[in-house]
A protein has these predicted regions:
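Membrane-proximal basic amphipathic "stem/tether" segments
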Residues: 1-16, 292-368
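Short, well-formed alpha-helical segments that are part of the catalytic scaffolds
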Residues: 14-18, 38-52
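A conserved hydrophobic helix/loop-capping motif in glycosyltransferases and polysaccharide synthases
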Residues: 30-39
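Active-site-proximal specificity loops/subdomain of glycosyltransferases
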Residues: 61-114
Length: 368
């Protein structure tokens, strides 16, 4: 007997609301999979994870030829992967941008396969957690719609680069786009999330002709899907095989409806400061993502909670609208205060050039 394709786009009746049972979490049940190329700050970031989650398992999944004995002392397991390489996907302001999707898939799955605990946090080597507040969000949003269950439990992801539409002036939709910078969930759910997407071809990664050229959300990018989209689209397709999303320009009303329903029922979206997510490289972006609704297109915690309260639980005490923690409010108002200044200074980038000319001219004369 042939199995019927599962679909969530045309329900025959209003979806049933189901509730996940509360689970007691502790660090001893968690494996941290720290994946990617070793960065100068990686050792310090591993120390922070060890300090904040002392009983957790630390798995470092990186490339062959990157051996350093100091990492052996702080991690429980080290995995050395063969590098599948990256592909040039765009030229932004004449700077080459690389698509590292295949690299992320290889190191993440190698780390997940080595992890021995029932819960896994996937962290990039240029990120860390500065506290353990992550665990407090696990049981906070238990209700879900029964016809949109992709994972056994929601996966926690940050608002940074979790999108519903682009932040470009066109504000084009970007379906199936949860963040891939950090994720925490049950190990079996994490395997479905990151393990369903195959390694993509060079054409898909960086030389794809868009089906609808006038719908490209970010014109400099030449991939078939954004990495985040490819990961989640294939995960969704593993459960709902009738789903079809040919490339990131192939969206319509039905796709957008399905995407939002799957995102809102399978993830917990938190602002970076709510879980202590930190990165030197992405520090400004992380601060911007803490703004409650001020970064166009991002799925912030307030956006997620508004949907959850309206769709699943009218009794939800909305965390992000209830001022949040003092630290969150400090970051929020500081960023709102500085954002106009930063925007103005970026527009005056030329102003620094005369000083740079004087500085390097003087150095050149001095050397002579």
């Amino acid at each position: 007997m042939k199995s019927k394709n599962r679909s969530i786009s045309k329900p025959v009746a209003p979806p049933k609301v189901v509730t996940n049972d509360a689970e007691n979490l502790s660090a001893r049940n968690i494996s941290f999979v720290v994946q990617g190329q070793i960065q100068p700050e990686t050792y310090t970031f591993l120390q922070a994870l060890r300090r904040n989650f002392p009983e957790a398992e630390l798995v470092l999944s990186t490339w062959r030829g990157k051996y350093d004995p100091c990492f052996r002392r702080i991690t429980d397991k080290m995995i050395y992967c063969k590098d599948p390489g990256a592909v040039v996907c765009s030229y932004y302001r004449e700077v080459v941008q690389w698509n590292n999707l295949n690299r992320q898939l290889v190191t993440t799955m190698a780390g997940l396969n080595a992890a021995s605990r029932p819960f896994v946090a996937k962290v990039r080597t240029d990120f860390t957690l500065e506290n353990s507040t992550l665990l407090s969000f696990w049981n906070r949003y238990p209700k879900r719609q029964s016809d949109a269950l992709l994972f056994r439990h929601r996966i926690i992801v940050p608002s940074l680069y979790s999108r519903v539409y682009s932040d470009q002036p066109t504000a084009l939709p970007i379906p199936f786009h949860p963040s891939d910078m950090f994720a925490f969930g049950r190990k079996d759910d994490m395997r479905r999330f990151f393990g369903s997407c195959p390694l993509l071809t060079e054409k898909e990664l960086g030389n794809w002709p868009p089906r609808y050229p006038n719908r490209v959300p970010y014109p400099s990018c030449r991939w078939r899907w954004a990495p985040e989209q490819a990961i989640f689209y294939y995960a969704a397709k593993s459960k709902f095989p009738g789903l079809r999303f040919d490339d990131w320009t192939s969206f319509n009303k039905e796709i957008l409806t399905v995407s939002k329903k799957l995102l809102m029922n399978n993830f917990i979206f938190v602002n970076p400061c709510q879980i202590g997510l930190f990165s030197y490289k992405h520090r400004d972006a992380l601060r911007g993502a803490n703004l409650h609704g001020d970064w166009p297109g991002l799925i912030t915690n307030s956006y997620f909670e508004d949907w959850y309260k309206a769709s699943l639980d009218s009794d939800l005490v909305v965390h992000s609208k209830n001022k949040g923690t003092a630290a969150e409010r400090y970051e929020l108002h500081k960023e709102r205060m500085l954002y106009p200044l930063k925007k103005m200074l970026r527009s005056l980038g030329w102003f620094a050039e005369p000083f740079a000319c004087l500085w390097y001219g003087a150095k050149n004369i001095y050397k002579r």
